[in-house]
């Protein structure tokens, strides 16, 4: 989210986000920023859900580990998380919704056809 630039108040300069925002303005798509965030975020949530449920369905699987649920803007940029770089919710999914597929007990339904 290039609108988070103002939150960078320490030593890290968000030059990557500055460049992306400038490019979006030049290409006249900045006004669609929230639509892009919502669409890519919804896809990220679906992919996390699919990966976690696939792991849970795997016989004798010992568990799963996620690298990170937050965006990363370090040496490169990876805005792929369901949390922003400050570990705050992007509003893509609630805690309770996430627990439905990544909680202590997750019921899974197996069928040949639905």
Residue locations for each model-derived region?
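Substrate-binding clefts and catalytic carboxylate motifs of secreted carbohydrate-active enzymes
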Residues: 1-114
